[in-house]
Amino acid sequence: YPVLWLQTGGGFDYTDWARYTAIELYAAEAGIAVVCSGTFCSAYMDTVHGDFKYFSTLSIETPRVVRHLFPLSEDPRDNFLAGFSMGGFGSLKWWVRDPEKFASIGLFSGVKNICEMGPSLGNAPNKAAITDTEVKRVAEDDYMFSSAVGDPSLLIGTENDISGMIVKQMAAGKKFPKAYMATGVEDTHYLDNKYFIEKYQSLGIEVYKTIDHGAHNWEYCDKHVKKYLDWLV
């Protein structure tokens, strides 16, 4: 079976896609298996504090186990990544490390690069346009993910730096599959999302961009996970 590796947002677990969207219906219509992952507030990282190997579990152990249990294809043409919010970062991290393993990636209000988003907005894109809502949101994110991430500025140049990894992998001759990226103008991550969509395009990534109305919520994800699966056909 073709398979969609689907990551949820911060503070959630693997059941949320099934509970808050119609992903089971959409997957049945598309004839695709879906493997949902959720790692609470870990940013899908092997954490800085504590020995919690969330990214290793997601990207190494989970595929090995589920392919042992179920007849899921290993053909890159049959493998797809997607994520909401923090799950967007986890999906991107997997995608930039192993671009040859996937046909595409879908991000729905997906966090694009943690080390360029804080902690004090000093690294944030479009600083002149930052609103009080953005300031509050970044402060909340810093607190929520601090035990996993540590100081986000220390991630620059590591495997957790998505922009840096794209440049590094391209220099090594890696080819990246196409990307579907959607963000709503009412989203609290809108400035970040718009900036990174344009940045990844400038780095040579083929991006199908959607900027429409919608907030950082499951209603938006439900709409765009369906659009993403339709886009794959």
Model regions and ranges:
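Non-catalytic cap/lid and distal C-terminal segments of serine-dependent acyl enzymes
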Residues: 1-233
